[in-house]
């Protein structure tokens, strides 16, 4: 579990293919490795990954084929920056929202414009089904960053990034055409499942 508050920006040092068609990615991030252990969970661009090796300055994670299909991590190469967040502790302040690190899809930046010191981004998701879980003023995690929806329609959604956040995450430097990882707020998914089950149960009872 994560909060969507990025702790550090790491730098990809190496990416190697693995025999299971996945990747092994080595990331430089000494600022978050003081209490690192093999098996720890770290969100990389919002994707929950497991630490397989580490030293004082770097850690390595394995990226499964499913994660490569659903995320933008397959585009990462040596020198690229990535958002990083360690899994929450019981003492962690929940300053963002509950983020699982299970990316639903990617979205393309279709508009980026300055609004005073803030930046307005508009995105088109690759898989439109996620739009039903996105609501005005609701939460969304983009590349692991907890953000608030400012607009949503039948094909796109928008957020505003304040100047403070711009200096803490990688998305501020992304441009039109770039991809971001999308994880919608889980509350919508749970609500949908409960409602569907309730309706199905009601139909069975009325037809009995």
UniProtKB/Swiss-Prot annotation:
It catalyses: 2 6,7-dimethyl-8-(1-D-ribityl)lumazine + H(+) = 5-amino-6-(D-ribitylamino)uracil + riboflavin. GO terms for cellular component: cytosol; nucleus. 2,4-dihydroxypteridine 1 binds at residues 4-6, 146-148, 160-165. Signal peptide: none annotated. Catalyzes the dismutation of two molecules of 6,7-dimethyl-8-ribityllumazine, resulting in the formation of riboflavin and 5-amino-6-(D-ribitylamino)uracil. Its EC number is 2.5.1.9. The lineage of its organism: Eukaryota, Fungi, Dikarya, Ascomycota, Taphrinomycotina. It comes from Schizosaccharomyces pombe (strain 972 / ATCC 24843). Keywords: Repeat, Riboflavin biosynthesis, Transferase. It comes from the Eukaryota. Pathway: Cofactor biosynthesis; riboflavin biosynthesis; riboflavin from 2-hydroxy-3-oxobutyl phosphate and 5-amino-6-(D-ribitylamino)uracil: step 2/2. Lumazine-binding repeats lie at residues 1-97, 98-195. The gene is rib5. This is Riboflavin synthase. GO terms for molecular function: riboflavin synthase activity. Homotrimer. GO terms for biological process: riboflavin biosynthetic process. Pfam families: Lum_binding. Gene3D superfamilies: 2.40.30.20. PANTHER family: RIBOFLAVIN SYNTHASE, RIBOFLAVIN SYNTHASE ALPHA CHAIN. 2,4-dihydroxypteridine 2 binds at residues 48-50, 62-67, 101-103, 137.
